């Protein structure tokens, strides 16, 4: 589980029904002069995830699968090689609450133009703010959640695949148009 303050891994052994867990501090926070801005270093997070995976691989040789959970509203931008080209903008990021047009904040403005619920901290509200303010990295090719980024890195791929449940958590999602 890739949480905002900690990252943990769990091994479940079905024959003995035993559970072993490892928890590590998520020390990836990036300081900012703006108190509304909440970012983390995506590569530090991935290094912690890899540390946990390696620890389990050393202790347990017959791991049959890996499941990933974590912060579901935040986004990280990736380039065509699948490398992070931005920090992880976490679910706590408040840029969507900043004033925009017609005395509305970014989240409300996006909700009004799309017709979909939108809240500050949701990935597509963050992305909307970043677009409007020229903050999307020039080499950004995709965006994804930190879980999708972790799965991409663990599997050796260079394009994130977003599960519909994660896509829905970013906001502005219509399950009927899947």
PLM feature spans:
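Short, compositionally biased low-complexity segments
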Residues: 24, 101-103, 154, 158-159
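Short, charged, surface-exposed secondary-structure boundary motifs
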Residues: 31-36, 98-102, 171-173
């Amino acid at each position: 589980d890739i949480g905002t303050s900690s990252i943990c891994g769990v091994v479940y052994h079905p024959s003995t029904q035993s559970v072993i867990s490892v928890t590590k501090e998520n020390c990836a926070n990036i300081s900012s002069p703006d108190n509304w801005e909440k970012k983390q270093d995506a590569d530090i997070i991935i290094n912690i995830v890899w540390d946990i995976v390696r620890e389990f691989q050393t202790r347990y040789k017959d791991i049959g699968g890996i499941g990933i959970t974590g912060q579901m509203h935040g986004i990280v931008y990736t380039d065509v090689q699948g490398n992070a080209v931005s920090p992880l903008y976490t679910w706590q990021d408040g840029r969507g609450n900043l004033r925009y047009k017609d005395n509305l904040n970014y989240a409300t403005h996006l909700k009004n133009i799309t017709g979909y619920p939108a809240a500050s901290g949701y990935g597509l509200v963050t992305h909307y703010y970043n677009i409007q303010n020229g903050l999307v990295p020039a080499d950004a090719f995709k965006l994804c959640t930190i879980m999708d980024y972790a799965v991409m890195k663990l599997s050796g791929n260079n394009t994130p695949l977003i599960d519909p449940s994660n896509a829905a958590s970013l906001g502005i999602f219509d399950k009927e148009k899947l």
